[in-house]
Amino acid sequence: MIIESFEGYCQEVVIPALKEDAANGRWKSIAPSSFLTEKGQNYYVIFVDYVVENILVLRLSLCGVLEKNDTFVINCKCQFTNSVPDEEQRIEAIISNCYQEFVNMGFGASVGSNGLCVWASLSEEEGQYVVDGIEDPYDLYSTFIDIIETATKTL
């Protein structure tokens, strides 16, 4: 799959609660299918909402960085290089491949009834929030798109 373009817009949302897993120091989804919030935590959550024809819609949630919980809905216009038999199998393939690629890149991830949930903890350094060395949270757009392109290049 080749992602030809993407755009984002914001909306206020409530997002799934995440909890630090003390055993391995990674972020763990404690309720991937429910919608709860935990005060004072900073994290990203991505959902693969749906795929319609050649449009892949991702929902990227950002909590704790801005005054309100903002969601950036990323509409990716996709060109699938190979035909997948039906819509359901295509979505399953995208979710499966993206899950593995995000895990390989060091993100926390889980697959639940609401699709793919991907997260990364944020830390504040010198007044800026950083994720894996990316100072501006909005720069994660290109990182996410690169990961998705890699994960779906055989689809």
Place the predicted regions along the sequence by residue.
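Acidic metal-coordinating catalytic centers involved in nucleic-acid phosphodiester chemistry
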Residues: 1-12, 132, 140-154
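Charge-rich, low-complexity N-terminal segments
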Residues: 1-59, 66
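Short glycine-rich, low-complexity/disordered patches
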Residues: 19-37, 102-124, 146-155
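Intrinsically disordered, low-complexity regulatory segments enriched in Ser/Thr/Pro
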Residues: 47-132
